[in-house]
Amino acid sequence: MRSWVVGARLLLLLQLVLVLGAVRLPPCTDPRHCTDPPRYTPDWPSLDSRPLPAWFDEAKFGVFVHWGVFSVPAWGSEWFWWHWQGEKLPQYESFMKENYPPDFSYADFGPRFTARFFNPDSWADLFKAAGAKYVVLTTKHHEGYTNWPSPVSWNWNSKDVGPHRDLVGELGTAIRKRNIRYGLYHSLLEWFHPLYLRDKKNGFKTQYFVNAKTMPELYDLVNRYKPDLIWSDGEWECPDTYWNSTDFLAWLYNDSPVKDEVVVNDRWGQNCSCHHGGYYNCKDKFQPETLPDHKWEMCTSIDQRSWGYRRDMEMADITNESTIISELVQTVSLGGNYLLNVGPTKDGLIVPIFQERLLAVGKWLSINGEAIYASKPWRVQSEKNSVWYTSKGLAVYAILLHWPEYGILSLISPIATSTTKVTMLGIQKDLKWSLNPSGKGLLVFLPQLPPAALPTEFAWTIKLTGVK
């Protein structure tokens, strides 16, 4: 009798388990009460609630690479095709008449994009030496040519035309061998794609281009290369509803192979920039004046007049080393990341002047990286735009962009205590300091050394511990 009762109870318990297993509970949307990861819905309130993966804020410095068929004419800028045949600017029409046959089309540049000297390991070594923690490569710019064998970019991709190589895949392999995060730039629009022009003519009430080209390529890039970052662009003519951006991002955050680590920017529709996305670019070369309340990135180019390589650049167009370091310092102090662009040649070479600038950043970071990587904004960001602060743990870093008169640095913001200690990164000895006669902050007596003996040529970092 007892065994029959026990058996009956076990049977009832099994039935209960089966019933409960068949019940589909609604997804948890409040991370505070979830045991499983939340499911994001395809709308901005939900997508914007996703926490930014920590690696991006810790990285601080990345390298941007603009490379494509525009690297063949290498004149004016990477917008060459649009300036020539979209806007029909006279200087571009004259350039073509003077240098190419009358019937030469933009597609004829494709076979000349050879990447003959492209060595992904050499590029990756350079980016590593530059101190970059992530690299973003153009997979497709507004011209529509793809740097990978896109199945929906027939005869206008790097496998079919030009290099006959998977440039995105090769660089990704080399980058990741060096523990650098890999990001992919992708333009939503294509200037002259017939389906895009058809949708444009229809007032973007149809989505022939999005369904046949944009979305298939984005899903392919994610599944094929598993990027750490997607740098979207080319959004400005249409709302995010045309691009189906929220549907893609919901899949990316919920079900993609990179759902836990991937980071995205804010260019997903004409209504999104500086409002929606993982982090904000807002606009090219964006520099806020005060500390934003959202993670952001400043993207800028060593060549101030172009993102792609151009043969007509002059020395005056090249950003100097001290300006690059100053922008990096100010960006990080204000809570941002700094993404510095280079444009390789059609052959796949990064010209010496670009290499020199990148290596200068790497040299500076080898001494001062402690104040940059994984740092946080301090309670005060700057003093008189000549001293910029960062913090990490109990340490505060004051980065001075100009050497003060008589070698005495006045800092108003830090409050000294009985345990205050002051050093300069790159110099072993403690620095002497005293309370500021003004009653606020302290005076730091900088090392009396010839310029060649200082840790760096510009932007010196004072490390403060035991201050409030």
From Swiss-Prot:
Q: Where does it primarily localize?
A: other
Q: What is this protein called?
A: Tissue alpha-L-fucosidase
Q: What does this protein do?
A: Alpha-L-fucosidase is responsible for hydrolyzing the alpha-1,6-linked fucose joined to the reducing-end N-acetylglucosamine of the carbohydrate moieties of glycoproteins.
Species in which this protein is naturally found = Bos taurus (Bovine)
Keywords linked to the UniProt accession: Glycoprotein, Glycosidase, Hydrolase, Lipid metabolism, Lysosome, Phosphoprotein, Signal
EC code(s) of this entry: 3.2.1.51
State the signal peptide span. 1-22
Subcellular localization is given as:
Lysosome
